């Protein structure tokens, strides 16, 4: 369950009210801001599952089923499989095109650094994922990225070339806020992971994810997102910077 579906489950009105309360309590010094789009959903009465409509339509007329995996092609060589690439944020080069997992920078920035076209993949869990978002520095690179993901039996989705993409930015910022919570004595790491897994239906907690990608990757990704977006709320928490 992703964050948007989760807000439908909780209730858009409940989620928006809590977000505003937390934001106001910290005088705006939070890792997030209440979203006007969510307020518009509340005003429209689209409260989520309980009202039959929220981000998604629960009237039974539509389906939010996962996409069907796309058939493999010759790029499905074993050394390119994500589980064979080692820890952290691995990368490969295919026909002069660099393919790497996002480290917070856009594909265009990565291409300037590499001096070559670049495909940037969003984070995904290799064992369970059925789809993956990616950005590319040009259309030729995008074609290679789509073919590679299809070879991995993942449905490829080209998305806007933004810092941190979608999943990685979301997970990194959740880990950032979780680090703040530990520093403030709200809970310890195990407690936060358990609360999000069993209370909010997360498949894993933010600290478990951070262990998988590495603390240095969390910090560098957040720094790149903060620089690329210009939003200070993405600046790494002292919890993470003190551990690298």
Regions found by a protein language model. Give the residues of each.
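NAD(P)-dependent Rossmann-like dehydrogenase/reductase catalytic/cofactor-binding core
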Residues: 1-244
């Amino acid at each position: 369950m992703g964050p948007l579906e989760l807000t439908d489950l909780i209730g858009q009105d409940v989620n928006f009210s809590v977000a505003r309360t937390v934001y106001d309590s910290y005088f705006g010094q939070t890792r997030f801001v209440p979203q006007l789009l969510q307020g518009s959903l509340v005003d429209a009465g689209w409260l989520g599952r309980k009202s039959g409509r929220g981000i998604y339509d629960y009237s039974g007329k539509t389906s939010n089923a996962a996409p069907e995996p796309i058939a493999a092609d010759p790029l499905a060589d074993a050394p390119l499989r994500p589980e064979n690439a080692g820890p952290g944020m691995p990368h490969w080069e295919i026909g002069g095109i660099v393919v790497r997992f996002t480290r917070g920078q856009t594909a265009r920035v990565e291409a300037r650094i590499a001096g070559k076209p670049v495909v940037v993949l969003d984070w995904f869990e290799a064992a369970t994922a059925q789809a993956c978002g990616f950005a590319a520095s040009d259309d030729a690179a995008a074609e290679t990225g789509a073919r590679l993901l299809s070879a991995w039996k993942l449905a490829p989705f080209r998305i806007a070339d933004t810092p941190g993409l979608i999943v990685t930015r979301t997970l990194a910022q959740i880990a950032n806020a979780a680090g703040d919570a530990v520093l403030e004595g709200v809970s310890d790491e195990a407690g936060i992971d358990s609360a999000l897994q069993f209370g909010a239906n997360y498949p894993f907690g933010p600290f478990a994810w951070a262990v998988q990608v590495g603390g240095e990757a969390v910090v560098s990704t957040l720094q790149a997102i903060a620089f690329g977006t210009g939003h200070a709320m993405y600046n790494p928490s002292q919890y993470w910077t003190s551990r690298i």
